[in-house]
Amino acid sequence: MKATRALVLFLLTVLLCPALASAGTLGPALNYEELLDMVRRAKDGDILLVSGEMTATEEAISSPALLQISGDSRAVLHRLHISDSSVVLSDVELRDSLTISGISNVELRAVRVEGAPGQSGLSLVGGGTLLIDGDCEITGGEGATGVSVSQRGGDLYVSVEGSIRGGEGGGSGMEVSPLSEYGTMMLAGTIRGGNDAMMGGTGLNLFGLSGNAFITVAGSIRGGRGAAGGAGMQVVSIGDTVSIGVNGEIRGGSGDEYGGNALIVMDAAGAAAVNLSGMLIGGDASAQTGEPGQSLLVIGDSVAHTRVANCLLQDGENTFAYNKAVTPLPEITSSVNAVEPLTTPSPTATSTP
């Protein structure tokens, strides 16, 4: 039932997309008020063109119609909020975060998202579908998460094929909490924690999963760099019949004093399972007394819920190297022929008394 519902949500978005081919075109909108006016007038499949730079007001994009908002090479939208809508966003740059709420179906194509300072690049609170295509880049604001997902009030399907990164200052790459009944995710892109002088951000955080939530991690996940490297992936507090499958590459972040652990699993209960068949590689440490990260750290009774099959486990390494200074020979600055020979004086005769 879980897989069927997720498939229906996915196909709903995909099957409606052909309507875009015969859609009407509105715009271009040069400011947010013009964009809102087009949204109110739009019908299923309409393409809304935007151009230039605009800042959203407190009024969210909300429409019962399936829409495509498409930009030109100069289109920049600030503080965009989409609520209870089905929207395809393409060829636009989104600054100061993208917020999605309610039951929404959103697809990002060739979209670059940058979070405001201290805020996630993309924040989803609700249900529906979120598709992040492979040509998308999402970065969290300073110290903040790249993508934050909280399932509230409906089925949820999330597919990630693009690049996600936590903000500088140790932001996590992606956080999911909570995820419950009929929550399904396919994470096949690249997810990185942000770097920091002290502690790198975690690549992927999965917290508070319940019901029959299902997540497949098939991409490349890595913790951020710092004095202590961030963990590649953390799974904390999962229960019921939650299933997490890892067949991608998970790496702890490199650090000066401590390398990050590749995968940490703790507080697993019920019939929840974490199935590992990919690559888990701990982060390296570069200081002389640095401690590399572990490939897999399972805490307490979570051992009974973690299954390893055909999985490469490799702890990090201490990469400290002594600097063997070599004193160079003096440089010859002139030709041998230019050196004047030393004259040996002749002996002087002395008289004998």
Which residue stretches match the model-derived regions?
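Right-handed parallel beta-helix/beta-solenoid
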Residues: L15-D37, E53, E340
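Bacterial N-terminal signal peptides that target proteins for export
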Residues: M1-F10
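Surface-exposed loop/turn motifs in large extracellular/passenger domains
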Residues: D44, S63-Q68, I82-D91, T99-A110, ...
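Ser/Thr-rich, Proline-interspersed low-complexity disordered segments
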Residues: A21-A23, L342-T352
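N-terminal extracellular ligand-recognition/capping segment immediately after the signal peptide
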Residues: L30-L36, G45-L67, D72-R79, V92-L94
